């Protein structure tokens, strides 16, 4: 009710507006006149998506149609997407319009197999349709996003967590910054950029906010998981983006990627959005099998008609198995994913369409062991269950509100990581199990034992979003007003980190930082709520149409309020030329891994009296407990700017876009100097079969160590240019050409000072204080896609030529001289420009921090071939070869060859419609 009242107040601002409640009726059918139930219709100028009823019928307000025409996109599973423009005059003459869709196969002309610019929700939107997904023979979303301009085309990798970054040249591996293929190399800059992308599946947000599958943050100074500690597969995506491997490509109908300014309805993001629409429609059984050398993937789906009363049911199943190295049994991957979607009409009078969907996924490879090791076993289990209820209704004529959209979802995951190995306790590993400060008695671990570390997480996410909208006419302008409210609760109800102190991996109190258990349940939680208001303006002018989407999002996150204004503008001229601009601010809530780090336990052995007699044996250690939580941690946010121009006619379209994106308050770990006075003890006497007597040995010793705390330290400024074009048909060759040229530049560094890691208590300056390091990267990447289709044969060839023209990494903007130091009283002392270069502080100067300037020494081209053949209307055979010419240029650096292209990979795909 509050939502309706608020929207009424907004509508009151248009008191003199001409409100029209007239409708037109659309009927969506196939070429045989058979109705297509629950087809999707997108009114692009208004940014609205509608769903037809069980008879393929849909009512639209005539106010949505302008004199210069409104563009509609109509889609249905198994049918070719159709785009058409309908003018207001045509609507006035015909109140009923029939739209027929063709079967989607290779016998149609002009099959699009590339990502295309489609300004639906944003000027920067890129659309990847099902034909493109089939052409690249994608196994998961990780392969699909490689179709985006500027993204390297890589071999499928199911053994490293895959993430996406947009509009940046951030390097994942600073040790080898020119390696475009090290997708598993994460640093804090890349992690923040990937974490800031929102993923929305059929209107339901996917979240990685409460993923806590990590070892101690304060102990290691970042996100450290089993793959780093125990050399297993890299499943690391804590505090990073969603793992794209877990979203199978077989169930996806289309993907819209917003790399610039997203509409106000999308929140909890700072670096763009990925909107995924899955396959749903009335279809026969369809199946697909894809095979590579080390990957097997099978999928099956069907759309069932349940009658007019009960609507339609879609079922999809996907199975994938992969082996990275047949010699290493710890590195296999097997997953299964199930999806069921039920769509039905609740009320035809209200045009109330409702959809209930259920998703379940699980890895099924179970416990993995190394047969060559005495005992070395690892297990990574991940189960996900997601339930979503979404729908839309359009009240009758003369209602205050044109439509209401709603989306409610529940997501529950079980994440489990385990590693165990046999330990021969030759070093007398100690048992350190104290959770409090002070001295503690202990004993040595058994001579032989199995060390076990488990991390058990159960992320829970509840979300709700309700949006009401109203379309109004004011003179020649059309306003589509939207008002939404949202709420989101997330928590982690897992057992947490489970560690048996009596069977340690490391050397307990002799090693500094010890392992402890850490419970997640009733501790890890996030709450967000807010509202947004948006106006979509469409104004016909003498020379074209002006469209503006302006919105304001107000939300409460991380115990603070945030306001995000956003605007997308476009002026489309009648001659096909258009100009656009956009600006927006967006906020991303910090991950719980940063908000709720576990305590750090500094354990120091102070007394040792070993004996084979358990009554005489005694060890003591001192524990200091540190809480690394930063209560002042803020949400990272981004300013995004964008300008561009585009041109389109019947056979050719192109766009040129420039962007500037400033990321502020990115999260990284800061080393904090910690001091601990330790008094050692020595044995005074040893009575037979009794505890020893001990006394202090010498003076207390000062122990210096570090722990790590999360802070808003990172800054990055990203700028670039994107040129994209598409030529449908070069006659008489019948060749389609799609190209993209992308230049990205990124400047990224930490803000504030940093403390050196070298400590010397005998010096006047215990440790140095230095200016932050700065890095910059830029790159130029082009992709040329050549498509030859022979519709009469159902045959299509696609050749993708990708060039890395240059990649450059520069570390600069600092010097080797300290800006200050920490004295023996552990106070900070700062130096002026003359003092910092004094020979008195020579020992504080950095020796390994000279500026680095690395450039790609050669131009690196690559070529990839795809071939698909339709046999009849049921069977499709496909093959693709990455690096088809096996061109692998290399350079030698420090006696080692560095290759710039991956080895060739061949994949086969067989699809069949029963």
Tell where the protein language model's regions lie, with residue ranges:
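Short, acidic, small-residue-rich periplasmic hinge/interaction motif at the N-terminus
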Residues: 27-31, 39-42, 73-79, 91-134
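N-terminal periplasmic "start-of-domain" segments of outer-membrane beta-barrel proteins
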Residues: 40-42, 48-57, 110-139, 144, ...
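N-terminal periplasmic accessory domains that precede
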Residues: 94-100, 141-144, 162-165, 200, ...
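Extracytoplasmic beta-strand/coil segments of soluble accessory domains associated
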Residues: 142-228
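C-terminal beta-signal and adjacent terminal beta-strands/loops
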Residues: 227, 662-665, 669-671, 803-825, ...
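Outer-membrane beta-barrel transmembrane domain signature of Gram-negative proteins
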Residues: 434-546, 587, 595-598, 718, ...
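Gram-negative outer-membrane beta-barrel transporters
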Residues: 542, 658-662, 681-813
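Outer-membrane beta-barrel signature, preferentially recognizing the C-terminal barrel domain
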Residues: 587-664, 684-694, 701-729, 775-778
């Amino acid at each position: 009710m509050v939502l309706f009242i608020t929207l009424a107040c907004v509508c009151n601002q248009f008191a003199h507006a001409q409100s029209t409640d007239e409708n037109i009726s659309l009927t969506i059918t196939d070429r045989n006149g058979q109705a297509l139930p629950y087809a999707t219709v997108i009114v692009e100028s208004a940014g609205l998506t509608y769903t037809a009823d069980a008879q393929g019928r849909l009512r639209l307000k005539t106010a949505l149609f302008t004199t210069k025409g409104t563009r509609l996109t109509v889609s249905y599973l198994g049918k070719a997407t159709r785009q058409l423009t309908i003018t207001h005059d045509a609507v006035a003459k015909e109140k009923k319009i029939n739209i027929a869709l063709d079967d989607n196969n290779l016998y149609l002309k002009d099959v699009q197999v590339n990502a295309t610019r489609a300004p639906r929700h944003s000027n920067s939107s890129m659309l990847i349709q099902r034909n493109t997904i089939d052409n690249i023979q994608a196994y998961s979303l990780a392969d699909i996003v490689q179709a985006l301009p500027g993204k390297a085309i890589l071999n499928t990798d199911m053994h490293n967590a895959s993430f996406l970054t947009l509009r940046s040249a951030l390097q994942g591996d600073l040790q080898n910054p020119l390696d475009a293929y090290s997708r598993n190399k994460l640093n804090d800059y890349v992690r923040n950029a990937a974490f800031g992308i929102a993923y929305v599946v059929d209107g339901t947000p996917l979240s990685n906010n409460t993923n806590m599958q990590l070892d101690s943050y304060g102990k290691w100074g970042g996100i450290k998981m089993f793959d780093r500690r125990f050399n297993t597969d890299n499943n690391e995506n804590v505090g990073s983006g969603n793992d794209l491997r877990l979203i199978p490509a077989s169930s996806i109908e289309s993907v819209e990627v917003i790399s610039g300014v997203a509409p106000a309805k999308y929140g909890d993001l700072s670096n763009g959005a990925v909107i995924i629409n899955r396959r749903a429609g009335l279809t026969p059984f369809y199946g697909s099998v894809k095979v590579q050398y080390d990957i097997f993937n099978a999928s099956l789906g069907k759309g069932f008609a349940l009658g007019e009363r009960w609507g339609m049911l879609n079922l999809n199943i996907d199975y994938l198995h992969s082996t990275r190295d047949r010699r290493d049994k710890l590195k296999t991957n097997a997953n299964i994913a199930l999806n069921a979607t039920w769509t039905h009409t609740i009320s035809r009078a209200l045009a109330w369409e409702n959809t209930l969907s259920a998703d379940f996924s699980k890895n099924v490879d179970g416990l993995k062991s190394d047969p060559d090791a005495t005992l070395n076993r690892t297990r990574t289990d991940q189960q996900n269950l997601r339930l979503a209820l979404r729908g839309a209704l359009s009240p009758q004529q003369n209602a205050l509100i044109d439509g209401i959209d709603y989306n409610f979802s529940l997501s529950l995951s079980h994440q489990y990581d385990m590693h165990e190995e046999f330990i021969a306790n030759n070093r007398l590993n100690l048992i350190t199990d104290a959770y409090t400060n002070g001295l503690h008695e202990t004993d040595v671990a058994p001579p032989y034992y199995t060390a076990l570390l488990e991390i058990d997480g159960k992320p829970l996410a509840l979300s709700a979003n309700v949006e009401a909208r109203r379309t109004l006419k004011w003179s020649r302008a059309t306003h589509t007003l939207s008002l939404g409210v949202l709420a989101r609760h997330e928590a982690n109800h897992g057992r947490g980190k489970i560690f048996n102190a009596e069977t340690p991996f490391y050397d307990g109190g002799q090693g500094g930082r010890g392992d402890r258990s850490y419970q997640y349940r009733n501790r890890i939680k996030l709450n967000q709520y807010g509202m947004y208001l948006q106006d979509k303006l469409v104004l016909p002018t003498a020379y074209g149409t002006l469209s503006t989407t302006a919105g304001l999002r107000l939300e409460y996150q991380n115990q603070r309020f945030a306001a995000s204004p956003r605007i997308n503008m476009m002026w489309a001229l009648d001659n096909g030329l258009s100009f656009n601009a956009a600006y927006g601010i967006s906020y991303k809530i910090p991950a719980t891994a940063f908000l709720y780090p576990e305590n750090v336990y500094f354990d120091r052995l102070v007394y040792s009296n070993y004996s084979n007699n358990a009554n005489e044996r005694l060890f003591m250690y001192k524990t200091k407990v540190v809480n690394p939580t930063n209560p002042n941690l803020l949400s990272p946010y981004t300013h995004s700017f964008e300008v561009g121009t585009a041109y389109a006619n019947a056979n050719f379209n192109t766009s040129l876009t420039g962007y500037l994106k400033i990321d502020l308050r990115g999260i990284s770990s800061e080393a904090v100097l910690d001091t601990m006075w330790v008094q050692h003890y020595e044995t005074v006497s040893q009575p037979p079969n009794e505890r020893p007597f001990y006394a202090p040995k010498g003076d207390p010793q000062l122990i210096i160590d570090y722990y790590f705390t999360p802070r808003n330290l990172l800054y990055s400024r990203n700028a670039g240019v994107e040129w994209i074009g598409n030529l449908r048909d070069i006659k008489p060759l019948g060749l389609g050409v799609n190209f993209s040229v992308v230049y990205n530049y990124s400047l990224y560094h930490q803000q504030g000072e940093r403390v050196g890691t070298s400590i010397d208590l005998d010096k006047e300056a215990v440790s140095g204080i230095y200016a932050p390091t700065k890095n910059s990267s830029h790159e130029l990447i082009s992709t040329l896609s050549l498509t030859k289709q022979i519709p009469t044969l159902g045959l299509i060839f696609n050749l993708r030529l990708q060039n890395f023209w240059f990649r450059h990494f520069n570390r600069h903007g600092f010097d080797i001289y300290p800006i200050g130091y920490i004295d023996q009283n552990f106070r900070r002392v700062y130096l002026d420009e003359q003092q910092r270069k004094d020979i008195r502080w020579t020992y504080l100067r950095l020796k390994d921090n000279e500026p680095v300037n690395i450039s790609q020494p050669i131009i690196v081209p690559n070529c990839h071939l795809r071939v698909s053949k339709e046999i009849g209307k049921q069977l499709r055979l496909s093959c693709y070869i990455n690096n088809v010419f096996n061109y692998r240029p290399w350079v030698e650096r420090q006696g080692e060859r560095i290759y710039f292209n991956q080895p060739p990979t061949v994949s086969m795909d067989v699809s069949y419609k029963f």
